[in-house]
Amino acid sequence: MNESNCTKIVNFLKGMRLKTNPNLPGAKQKTPLNIHRFYLLLIIIIYTATSACIYFDWTSIRNLLLNVGKYEHLNISKYADITLSPQYKKINNLYPMTLAIHFTMSVFCGFLYDHIGPKFTAIIGQGFNILSWIFLSIDTTKIDTTLIGFIFLGLGADTAFIPILTVSNLFPDISTFIMTVIGAAASLSYAVPATLNFVYKKYPHFPFYYICYGYIFIILIPCLLVATFLLPMKPFKGLDYYLENDQESDSKNKEQISYTDNDVEMQPSLIQNGNTNVSNNVNKNKATKNIIEGENFHKQSILLFFKVLLSYPSICIIVYFILFNISTVFYGMVTDIYFSYNKSIINIINILMPISFIPCIIFGRFINKYGAAIIIIIMNAFSALMHLTALIKHQAAGLISAFLYMCAASIYTSQIYCFLLNAFPSVVFGKLLGITSLFGGMFSLFCEKLYDNISNSSGNKNDPTTISILLAISFIIMFLPLSILYTRNYEKNIESVNSEKNQIQA
């Protein structure tokens, strides 16, 4: 029995080994400057790790702004509890605002990605990022330059990040894994504000604008050059584009077999399992290839976008992301309140967030093999549990909550990106990604109201218990539509498609 279990474990681990075929048509696409796809991926990982959504680790950003004295003039007197000060509340309110701008801009970024290409979209995004740090470097109370800086930070976050996702199409047999690797690199970017904070504390005699301009010249300008010279004018073609001819021939062969052979029981896998999925993929891929090669690309792409936007998987994933976004943003805003009994847990969160790339890569491997829907269900459970365990005033429960928060944050948007890539035509990927982010970002503004309402009537204590329980109940209810999403198998699982294709050919 033990040998049997060990054999199963060994076989499972062997099955999780990742292989990529360099001879696939998608892997042979021409790259800017003819750079090898692996070198391009490495550069993109560095680009992402240093300039992606750095404000997602809000605890570190908040500490940086507090240390450099942003909004310190709002404090009329000293506060024993910093979380009750006007300065702290003003800084905290920047988070949902920036996130709302970030995800609102995503819808425009999605259209730019699909219609003017990754290169120019990323250039615009890095331009916004540079403007953001220029405004943050200005120290004045006459104009709220901090607010303006975070507006540009929100505008540039996805505009600089989404275009680089096209690199995943150079690895067609592991594209979702590559997408989560890029997402893991984005998790590494959480270390940027903590690093800047460390530098500021290490060299307190340096003005803050030295640090801001250092970040601009050392990181952001090289990233702008990467966007200019190493990103393509048009997105790299997705897997569905290259699968069309093979799937059409497979479909025709199956039809010929079904007409010539009257014994249906001799071919159950073709009739019962394969035919529906293949026909659905053929229809989707026909749309992708015809739109890309057609004369009315922009019009047909937009029409297809509105068609798939009203489908069940699209609506379900948007509703889930709205709830997930509210939950994660609210958690980030109340960490000091959740763990006021033990501040060391907050320090642990600051350590866990930069290393959240590790679970992100692990989740990415499972997504590539089993699809994103099952990981989304797991993240739904983690989101409910991280709030409930945070309410238990015990160190062990607090550590569990911090770990669950790290896991949820590690695959924050990658879970959505991978599902959209697997479930919908690649020709509308940017627009679907953008509209999903738009809804998530707009509703994140609700977190500001939630934070303002967690103070009790005495006004000297914050209690997030009621809101946390309501969020947990919402996630429990969300299990039903997500389970339907999973059981209906909307995704095009890359590894399953390849294995089924090999079986049919055999």
From Swiss-Prot:
Disulfide bonds: none annotated. Gene3D superfamilies: MFS general substrate transporter like domains. Its main location: membrane. One of its GO terms (cellular component) is plasma membrane. Disruption phenotype: Growth is normal in asexual blood stages, however uptake of arginine and lysine is decreased. Impaired production of male gametocytes and fertile female gametocytes. Rare gametocytes that are produced have unusual membrane structures (whorls) and large vacuoles in their cytoplasm. The chain crosses the membrane at residues 38-58, 93-113, 116-136, 147-167, 174-194, 211-231, 302-322, 344-364, 372-392, 399-419, 427-447, 466-486. It is found in: Cell membrane. GO terms for molecular function: L-arginine transmembrane transporter activity; L-lysine transmembrane transporter activity. InterPro entries: MFS_trans_sf (IPR036259), SLC43A_AATransporter (IPR052599). Keywords: Amino-acid transport, Cell membrane, Glycoprotein, Membrane, Transmembrane, Transmembrane helix, Transport. Glycans are attached at residues 2, 5, 75, 277, 325, 342, 453, 456. It comes from the Eukaryota. The keyword Glycoprotein applies. GO terms for biological process: L-arginine import across plasma membrane; L-lysine import across plasma membrane. PANTHER family: PROTEIN FMP42. Belongs to the SLC43A transporter (TC 2.A.1.44) family. Cationic amino acid transporter which transports L-arginine, L-lysine and, to a lesser extent, L-histidine and ornithine. Plays an essential role in gametogenesis. This is Cationic amino acid transporter 8. The lineage of its organism: Eukaryota, Sar, Alveolata, Apicomplexa, Aconoidasida. The gene is NPT1.
